[in-house]
From Swiss-Prot:
GO terms for molecular function: 3-phosphoshikimate 1-carboxyvinyltransferase activity. HAMAP family: EPSP_synth (MF_00210). One of its GO terms (cellular component) is cytoplasm. The active site is at 306 (proton acceptor). The lineage of its organism: Archaea, Methanobacteriati, Methanobacteriota, Stenosarchaea group, Methanomicrobia. Keywords: Amino-acid biosynthesis, Aromatic amino acid biosynthesis, Cytoplasm, Transferase. Its main location: cytoplasm. It is an enzyme of class 2 (transferase). Gene3D superfamilies: Enolpyruvate transferase domain. This is 3-phosphoshikimate 1-carboxyvinyltransferase.
Length: 422
């Protein structure tokens, strides 16, 4: 699908979609426990892949309107009858890999061409060290993966610098292992807030995990029960309409943004630091951004990788130079997001230098161009925001990928008055 964006002001209000990260975890934790009633989930391509995978493990999942009810497997997943296709969802693949390690038989995972390029080596090693048998069919650490249970627990170490999803995966499944588990983190734990989200939800479900974030200690033979759970709004998705207000000198309010463990709430601090006017009514769950005179800043993206495409566009529209640092792990997402943003913003006239772990961006005037969305929802949405600030028209390919996390994205832009054709 092609999207065409013309220079526009944006005014008004929209609600943030439900959090993709919380929804994935609610489905996985609900499926591994006794029962869950999840209200206000994000039902998108990615999260529905997790629903399908958990059904394959034996969870009874029923979707009705704005509610998902789950009768879980209580730590004893069955062996799937067929290959599990995680589609484009790295979260599905990684969270469910550890679930597969509890099944008394072999599970096969695959995914689309993008997912089959994403690294899983540290998780494969961890599952093997815990007593399961796990390997990549091509020996590359990428899907297709074959996983045979049952993991027993034990003491392992895992690299924390590639993806925090590896750690979240183990935290969800290791409470059901036959022995206690200790996980030692090697190097910096990148994207730590996502692990905090996992721990928050497991604690609500009654699971006991001790940690200082360098070491995780998990008691064996537990079970848990998520019960009733409401999914919060997604700050990652909200970053796009908020940034749209900032780069066009407009005013936008985004609702359904209450305080939570989401690290991507840091977008509000970054907007303030760059010169936008930001007001967050935490009780009402509304964030209002009014564009100001933006200027470049230095940003550490180590804990907020999903904000990098948005931050790159803000930087492109700001005066001076912005340095986005500590972001090498952003290369291992649906696409290499550092390279993708550098490549596409250059087409729009932006001076941008790509480093192994970041971007140096000189702000200036943007010109509409034909750009590639790289089949990546965050690249597409970030480029759409850039198109709102660019002279002329911007044409974006693979626009359908927004269905992964924000299906109503283009409709919401239109609601705010943007000139959008899809």
């Amino acid at each position: 699908m092609i999207a065409r964006i013309s220079k526009s002001d944006v005014w008004g209000s929209v609600d943030a979609p439900p959090s993709k990260s919380y929804t994935h975890r609610a489905i996985a934790i609900g499926s591994m426990g006794h029962y869950a009633k999840i209200t206000g989930p994000l039902l998108s391509a990615d999260t529905l892949a997790t629903v399908s995978a958990c059904r394959a493990f034996g969870a009874d999942i029923r979707i009705s309107g704005d509610t998902v009810e789950i009768a879980g497997v209580i730590g004893k997943p069955r062996v799937p009858e067929d290959v599990i296709d995680a589609k484009n969802s790295g979260t599905t693949l990684r969270l469910c890999s550890s679930i597969a390690a509890l099944a008394e038989g072999a599970t096969v995972f695959t995914g689309d061409s993008s997912l089959r390029k994403r690294p899983n080596g540290p998780l494969i090693k961890a599952l093997n060290d815990l007593g399961a048998v796990c390997y990549s069919t091509r020996g590359t650490g990428t899907a297709p993966l074959i996983i045979h249970g049952v993991m027993k627990g034990g003491r392992i170490s895992i690299n924390g610098s590639i993806s925090s999803q590896f750690i979240s995966s183990l935290l969800i499944s290791c409470p059901f292992a036959k022995n206690d588990t200790t996980i030692l983190i090697e190097g910096e734990l990148k994207s730590k807030p996502y692990v905090e989200v996992t721990l928050e939800m497991l604690e609500k479900a009654g699971c006991r995990i001790e940690t200082n974030f360098e070491e995780f200690r998990i008691q064996c033979c537990q079970d848990y029960n998520l019960g009733e759970y409401r999914v919060p709004g997604d700050f990652s998705s909200a970053s796009y309409p908020l940034a749209a207000a900032a780069v066009t000198g407009s005013r936008v309010t985004v609702g359904n943004l209450f305080p939570s463990k989401q690290g991507d709430a840091a977008i509000l601090e970054h907007l303030l630091d760059m010169g936008a006017n930001v007001f967050w009514d935490e009780e009402m769950g509304t964030v209002t951004v009014e564009g100001g005179r933006l200027h470049g800043i230095d940003i550490d993206a180590g804990q907020t990788p999903d904000l990098v495409p948005t931050l790159a566009v803000l930087a492109a529209c700001a005066e001076g130079t912005t340095h986005i640092n500590n972001a090498e792990h952003v290369r291992y997402k649906e696409t290499d997001r550092l390279r993708a943003m550098a490549t596409e913003l250059r087409k729009m006239g932006v001076q941008i230098e790509e480093r192994q772990d970041g971007l140096d961006i000189e702000g200036g005037r943007l010109t509409g161009a034909t750009v590639d969305g790289h089949d990546d929802h965050r690249i597409v949405m970030a480029l759409a925001v850039a198109g709102l600030a660019a002279d002329g028209q911007t044409t974006i390919s693979t626009a359908e990928s927004v269905d992964i996390s924000y299906p109503a994205f283009f409709a919401d832009l239109g609601k705010l008055g943007a000139k959008v054709e899809v």
